[in-house]
Design a protein with these regions (language model features):
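Structured secondary-structure scaffolds
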Residues: 1-201
Length: 201
């Protein structure tokens, strides 16, 4: 919950070098003081599908945490008779090669067709909502390195994170600057960037 860390977000913001300084202290600082909890899901067609499958009654659910886990859950569904084949056929678990991941399509139109099986043997369909696209933007600094699955040294040893410098329009104080800062505070308890140039619209 953002409201539980908004004071920490404010404190961390004071360590960031903002140009102009007034944007960091004023516009962004005031936004952080009044930060509300962030609704992670959106009812849209584009974006990252929430990896949650539920039975029709809503009494059982599975939260899938990786492609490997989804692959294995699909295999269980095939064995239970809810699916006839694995759409990720040929995918090699543990192989992080780009060519291997090219076999996996996690777009909404694909994953919405995946039916999983609950612990009690009932069919489960995916939650229809998506993750807010701002979450994608805010997690970019480490997601681009496939962290935490690969390249841990780049993030854990501060080689590629936090960023030395970012720049965007002043409107991003409530967009990209905010989501970078919020996610970094929640996940790492540190800033996502050291220096910011905020220009006009």
């Amino acid at each position: 919950k953002v409201t539980e860390v908004k004071d920490r977000m404010f404190d961390l913001n004071e360590t960031i070098n903002w140009k102009p300084k007034a944007t960091g202290e004023g516009r962004f600082g005031n936004w952080l003081k009044n930060a509300n909890d962030w609704n992670l899901s959106r009812s849209r067609y584009w974006g990252i599908p929430l990896p949650i499958w539920r039975n029709e009654e809503g009494t059982e659910e599975i939260l899938v945490g990786s492609v490997e886990e989804l692959y294995n859950e699909i295999e269980k569904s095939i064995a239970a008779g809810f699916m006839t084949e694995n759409p990720f056929k040929g995918f090699e678990i543990g192989n992080m090669a780009e060519s291997n991941y090219d076999l996996v399509d996690l777009h909404k139109n694909v994953v919405d067709e995946i039916v999983l099986v609950s612990a009690s043997g009932k069919p489960m369909k995916r939650e229809s909502d998506l993750i807010d696209v701002w979450f994608d933007s805010g997690s970019m600094p480490y997601a681009q390195w496939h962290y935490p699955f690969e390249n841990k040294d780049k993030i854990d040893e501060n080689k590629a994170f936090p960023a030395d410098f970012i720049a965007e329009g002043v409107d991003q104080t409530r967009g990209w600057f905010y989501t970078l800062h919020a996610i970094s505070t929640l996940v790492f308890d540190k800033v996502a960037y050291k220096n910011v140039v905020s220009n006009g619209l």
